[in-house]
């Protein structure tokens, strides 16, 4: 792949940003996966543009389902990082990932959020952002909105849809989550979703507030195309959480098929999470000598790490594919690399593939088809280069930090995301 690092975007601030703003979110720095990188970048972008920015969040615990070293005792519950004031509260990670564990985790955390308000630790704000998941964050954030202020709820996952698809909880629990989603979101002033299909699902749920579609964003200055390392074999890269909803079992099966198509290629799984040991055991049982595991790369070396992948992977379980637009997809496009994803017809990724032609999709749970798509790209370096350039161009026009910041600022100030 060519090195296009000289053609980076200049940072530009929007015409106006709120003087003060609050983000209520379970996910934030230093968590390296999930929604945390995107929320961290959004908050720091507001701070860099002049907003007095506060984040109310959990002690970092994802992926891995344990509070990070140095945070459990509360000594880092009040920090200022990159101009953003970070306020954290007691966190009990959801061991096991079931519905009961998640409810305990979210109940304790959001009770702490409300206590922070009651004790005067975090005040009401005229401009409030919240992140779903958790829908409890959205409900709590409504309490932090000052009279006459605006609250914008950012929906990355639709929890009732994902919970039902992944078998978490029974019918009564799902009905309760749907009712909470509908009520909490209808009390926000505006809602942001990542894709048109997500907007459609919220409308079907009974959400009637204005909904803007703003794709996942990335700091396109920090994440940019870099040349691949010259001394490595052809590399297929997955980077992210080792969690159930990623459907990583199909990646191992894909690697088994790829071994006969491209015996010189390696499949590098870089990440951490609750499924790590299970995945390693499965890879060993299948005799996958072409699969390697590695930890997530530090944020400051993200562009370098992404450059290692000739072809990237964005797997999803089919049941949850309609409810989420993976942020990692946009990050890969910013790095000028193509990827192969699993998605359903009409889903957010399927529509984006048709729009920009910068990646390939295969049906979920079809590892042989996924392996063929990966091999086809490995065999066509010129095609990979062209797809990478198209993906990068789309990010610069639609998903860069400056483009997205202007839209969020408009929603907070006057309800206009144009």
Q: What label would you give each PLM region?
A:
Residues 1-75, 79, 258:
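N-terminal subdomain of nucleotide-sugar transferases
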Residues 59, 197, 214-217:
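Carbohydrate-associated surface elements
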Residues 246, 298-304, 312-333, 338-351:
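Nucleotide-sugar-dependent
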């Amino acid at each position: 792949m060519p090195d296009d690092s000289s053609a980076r975007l200049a940072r530009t601030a929007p015409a106006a940003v709120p003087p003060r703003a609050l983000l209520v979110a379970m996910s934030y720095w230093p968590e390296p996966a999930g929604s945390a990188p995107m929320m961290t970048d959004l908050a720091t972008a507001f701070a860099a543009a002049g907003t007095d920015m506060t984040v109310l969040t959990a002690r970092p615990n994802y992926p891995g389902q344990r509070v990070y070293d140095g945070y459990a005792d509360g000594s880092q519950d009040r920090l200022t990082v990159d101009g953003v004031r970070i306020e954290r509260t007691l966190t009990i990670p959801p061991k096991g990932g079931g519905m009961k564990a998640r409810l305990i985790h979210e109940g304790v955390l959001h009770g702490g959020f409300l206590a922070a308000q009651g004790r005067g630790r975090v005040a009401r704000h005229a401009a409030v952002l919240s992140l779903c998941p958790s829908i409890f964050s959205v409900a709590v954030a409504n309490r932090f909105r000052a009279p006459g202020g605006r609250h914008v709820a950012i929906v990355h996952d639709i929890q009732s849809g994902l919970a039902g698809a992944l078998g978490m909880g029974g019918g009564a629990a799902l009905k309760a989550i749907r009712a909470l989603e509908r009520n909490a979101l209808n009390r926000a002033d505006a809602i942001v979703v990542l894709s048109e299909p997500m907007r459609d699902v919220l409308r079907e749920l009974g959400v009637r507030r204005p909904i803007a579609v703003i794709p996942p964003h990335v700091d396109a200055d920090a994440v940019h195309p870099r040349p691949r390392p010259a001394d490595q074999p052809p590399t297929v890269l997955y980077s992210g959480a080792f969690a159930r909803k990623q459907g990583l079992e199909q990646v191992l099966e894909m690697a088994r098929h790829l071994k006969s198509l491209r015996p010189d290629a390696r499949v590098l799984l870089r990440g951490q999470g609750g499924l790590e040991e299970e995945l390693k055991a499965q890879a060993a049982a299948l005799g996958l000598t072409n699969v390697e595991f590695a930890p997530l790369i530090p944020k400051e070396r993200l562009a370098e790490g992404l450059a290692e992948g000739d072809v990237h992977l964005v797997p999803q379980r089919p049941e949850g594919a309609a409810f989420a637009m993976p942020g990692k997809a946009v990050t890969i496009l910013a790095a000028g690399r193509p990827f192969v994803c699993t998605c359903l017809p009409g889903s957010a990724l399927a529509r984006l593939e048709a729009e920009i032609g910068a990646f390939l999709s295969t049906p979920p749970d079809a590892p042989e088809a996924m392996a063929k798509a990966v091999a086809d790209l490995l065999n066509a370096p010129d095609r990979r280069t062209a797809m990478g350039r198209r993906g990068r161009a789309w990010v610069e026009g639609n998903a860069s930090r400056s483009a997205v910041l202007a839209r969020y600022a408009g929603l907070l100030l006057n309800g206009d995301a144009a």
